[in-house]
Structures are given as C-alpha cells and as structure tokens.
C-alpha cells in the first residue's frame, strides 16, 4: 500500500563533536560547519528573526555531541500514539531540553541500521516550519529520535483546551503547513505522508512547525502494521492503494483544518444540533440559508443523530470510516461562521480526485492565504492564553 520512496541523499553531513574543552581543530571544524550552514540558510526566504533563531538552534546543536541513552534525564511524558511515546527530557551534557520520541520495533540489526542512516536526512531539514532535529540512535530495543522541544505541544492537544480554533489562527497554521510542505518537496524531494493535528507543533514564541514526516522508507514499512485508532487523515487515493503524491498531503491538511475549525474529527459530518451546540447558535449551510445538512447517507446502526454536543455518537468502526472517506462526499466547513475564502480554500484541499485537487502553488496564492499573510495576528498571545503558558519576554505576533 505504501509506495517505496527513493532514498534522499543528504547534501550536508553534520557530525557534531563533543565539547571537551577548547581545541583549535574542533573549533575550526565547528566554525566551518556553521559557515556552511549559513550558506544553506541564505538560500531560504527567511526574515531576520527566523534566520537568527535557526542559527541559534544550529549553534546549540553543534555543541551537543554524540547522543547516548545514559545522557538523558526524563522529565515528563508529552504524548503517545501509534508511533511510540514522546517524552520531555534533559540532555545532561548540553543542558538542553529536548523532545525524545521512543519507537519500539522488533527488527533485525540491518533494518535498524538502515533506519538510523535514513533518519540522518533530518539533519538537512533546517526551516522555520520544520521541527529541529538533534539526532537519532538505537538503545535497548528502541529507536530514539531527538527533536526540538515545542512548549505548546501539538494542535490536537491545543484543540482540547481551545474547543475550537479561530479562523484567523488557522490562517497562520495554513501558511506554516504550506511553507513546510513546500520546503520538504522543493529542497529535499520529500513528502510528509502523515499531516494531521498531532504532527503540527506550536510554541510560545508563535512558531508553527511540522514533525514526523516520512524521511525513512524503512521506518514507514516497519511501522506499517502498527496503526490502531478510530480516525484517518489519509486521502481516498492512498486508502485505495493507488499512486499518491504531495496531493495526498494537501487532503490531510484540509481534513485537519476542518477538524480544528469545528472542534472534532469531521467524519461522519456533524448534524445541525451538534453545530448549534458548538457555535452557540443555529448554523446554516448554502446560499438559501437551509440548516446545515446531515450525512447524505443513512447512518450505520447505533449512530443516531444526537443533540448532546459534539462527538457524542459512538465512533465509526475503522472499516466504516475508511469506506466513508473513499465513497462519500468529502467534509466541508459550515456556512455562516467562516469566511467564503476559508470555505473555498478547504474545499479545494478536499477534492476527492487528486488530479483536480489544488496543488501547493495554487493554495499558496489563494485569497485566504494572501489575506492571512497580511493579517496581524497575535498567535503567540492566543496560544499562551489558551494553554496558560508564560509568554517569552520578547513576544512575537506570529512567527509566520
């Protein structure tokens, strides 16, 4: 079902040395390293703040040295999913706080080594819209992927606190996701393969970044049978096992935006009573002002229309859900509560035929994105209020 991806050869090799005191050789290598990285950053369209933050991250990273299990102090668990457990950890030698993802896999040493090799491509992924990567290693049956810690967590966690995420905030999210996907495609010929709210991370500085993208074909194959859940963000063509491309990432982004906007996974679609409970007033659909329609197909047994709030019905069985995605009309935003630009943007993402679905270039130039780029939105302030985080002393409006 998953297409084998051609391995991406890294354009730049990063082998940080352990800082054990001043050494002309190591210092010279480190400086040459940073000069090389700065040249890479100059190729990107960055503002001054983004450039300084990336340079600061890379300077810190150059001092980290080889990552080893014994050097980590576990602080807390950040989340768990199909891929494994993510913990907040302190790297003792450097003092840096990192997010450490532990993936337990029963695999042969040769496969394990290939995964670690393929993950090294992440060293090359330096963008304001991609979560920073410190390194990966294997220890005691687990692969550890060490990343930049994002103190706002993922958007699925933010949604639990916010209940619904406002359109102006989602405008900034859309810009960051599009720029992140474009960076992966243009600079590294990588598809994300797993765009969803839990893989969009945010922080109190107002940054929005993608994580968990598919750089390792071997890791994807090794985890292919580990899916357990009640929802899917995969496009219809991917579920049908046909050829898929970055257009599939566009579908996943559109589905994620609908979920974040209405407050719950949008399949099956919410009925009028659910929407009224969520938005606090009747929600209409269409130009003629009719109440928002329910699913065009009779609901499966045990899933009656319910007026007891969002997501109150039993979840669909996974086979029902996948059948719905492939055979039923795609989700859409209700009218009357979102701008026509936002509705149209999402509709273009959720066209079932990938050949007709909007591509990255079209979406980047869409009226919704152009309007969002021009809006002064205090994303950092909104996030800190929502999650009750302490805002940095030098707050930013948004890092997008």
Swiss-Prot record:
The protein, known as: Dual specificity mitogen-activated protein kinase kinase 2
UniProt keyword annotations, A-Z: Acetylation, ATP-binding, Cytoplasm, Kinase, Magnesium, Membrane, Metal-binding, Nucleotide-binding, Phosphoprotein, Serine/threonine-protein kinase, Transferase, Tyrosine-protein kinase
Annotated site (Cleavage): 10-11
Organism classification: Eukaryota, Metazoa, Chordata, Craniata, Vertebrata
Subunit structure: Interacts with MORG1. Interacts with SGK1. Interacts with KSR1. Interacts with KSR1 and BRAF; the interaction with KSR1 mediates KSR1-BRAF dimerization. Interacts with GLS.
Alphabetized Gene3D superfamilies for the sequence: Phosphorylase Kinase, domain 1, Transferase(Phosphotransferase) domain 1
GO CC term (a single one): cytoplasmic side of plasma membrane
Molecular function per GO: ATP binding; MAP kinase kinase activity; MAP-kinase scaffold activity; metal ion binding; molecular adaptor activity; PDZ domain binding; protein serine kinase activity; protein serine/threonine kinase activator activity
Modified-residue entries (Phosphothreonine), positions: 394, 396
Top-level taxon in the UniProt lineage: Eukaryota
Biological role stated in the UniProt entry: Catalyzes the concomitant phosphorylation of a threonine and a tyrosine residue in a Thr-Glu-Tyr sequence located in MAP kinases. Activates the ERK1 and ERK2 MAP kinases. Activates BRAF in a KSR1 or KSR2-dependent manner; by binding to KSR1 or KSR2 releases the inhibitory intramolecular interaction between KSR1 or KSR2 protein kinase and N-terminal domains which promotes KSR1 or KSR2-BRAF dimerization and BRAF activation.
InterPro entries linked to this entry: Kinase-like_dom_sf, MAP_kinase_kinase, Prot_kinase_dom, Protein_kinase_ATP_BS, Ser/Thr_kinase_AS
Binding site residues for ATP: 78-86, 101
Pfam name, any one: Pkinase
